[in-house]
Amino acid sequence: MKLKKKSVVAVLTLSMSMGSVLSMVPVFAETSQQNLALNKTAYVSAEYGTMPRKNLTDGNEKTRWSTESGPTQWAYIDLGQEYEMNKFQMFWENESTYASAYNIYVSNDLNSWGEPVLSRTDNKNVVSEELLGSKVSGRYVKLEVTEMKGYPNVSCYEFKIFNTDEKVQDPIWSVSNITSPTRTT
């Protein structure tokens, strides 16, 4: 009986210990970002043969929109209603053919695009991810490609638009980068 009691105590102690350990394991909520542009209608300045405008928002990163001629070319997405947004992703053709310069505009009507919410002139990424410092709202989102690297036509697999809680990270300042002012007498 004594052996049985010790076994029960050992099992209970182990169970309680495991419960404490397991309760310390962090649990992360899965966050999913909804692509506001998914399956929405795209309008474009030009399209080439078997690479039509609908490929830009079809959710398939194996189909693409392409133009026969080079920049400046544009595509705008009608989201169907006004949304807040702050993150944009563009999936360009490949590592040697991508937009090196582009602008993104957001509007509630097709007549007044205003100033771009983002202008990029130094892109070197096949997947361009842009996060704004603050959210903007609108029904229409326009991607204007002004320069391409590689082949001259514009070629993009997907244009994704998100409303996310992500924040732009502040730059990290290093004390070694800060200099004291020089005093002169």
Language-model features: locations:
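Exposed beta-strand and adjacent loop surfaces of beta-rich binding modules
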Residues: N39, M85, A99-N103
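Trp- and acidic/polar-enriched beta-sheet ligand-binding modules for extracellular glycan
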Residues: V44-Y48, E68-W74, W92-D165
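Beta-strand-rich structural segments
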Residues: K87-M90
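Sec-dependent N-terminal signal peptides of Gram-positive bacterial secreted proteins and lipoproteins
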Residues: L3-V27
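Disordered, acidic Ser/Thr/Pro-rich linker "stalks" and the adjacent N-terminal cap
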Residues: V27-G80, E93-Y98, Y151, K160-T185
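Intrinsic disorder/low-complexity segments in short proteins, especially the signal peptide
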Residues: S17-G19, T41, E84
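Hydrophobic loop/turn residues within beta-sheet-rich immunoglobulin-like superfamily modules
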Residues: L79-E82, K135
